[in-house]
Amino acid sequence: MGWSLTAPTLPGGSEWVQKDTISISNNQLDVTGTVFCARLADQGFALKIVETRTFHLTNPNFTDFYKTYHRCDVAGVTGEAYTESHFGNSGSTKTYYFTGIAAAGASIKVVVGVKVDTATQEISFTAPALLGPTVYIKVGGAWKQASAVYVKSSGAWKEGQLKINVGGAWK
């Protein structure tokens, strides 16, 4: 869990979905970042931020001065900030990844920016649906989507795992 420069492995049925693009400009640099989200197993999710920086002046210290700043807040809980001191050459692109836990429909806020002058932009969206089969239960004559399946075991209700037999194989 947390920030990385290594892409997580997406499970079958999951894909990167673009959420938004940010753009930050000042008199020394332009930052453009595209934010993607994907669902991982269980309640896990992943973010991908593809960021490009263009420096207007040729001062090599700008790549160290304008630090990368990323943060992911889930369900109103402020996440730990990720900062990186050296971005790379002007015009280069870098990809950052974040993995975390969020229930389907939970609020996710991604903060992308430049730490030195606190120039940031925020993107908010809801966590994607969980992977796996959708189960419907008839309640009062109407079919409703089940958010979880519970099984009574030894007098206590426990969340169960739903499996289906497809062509003789349990999935």
Task: Show where each model-derived region lies.
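Polar, enzyme-active/binding microenvironments
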Residues: 1-143, 147-149, 154-170
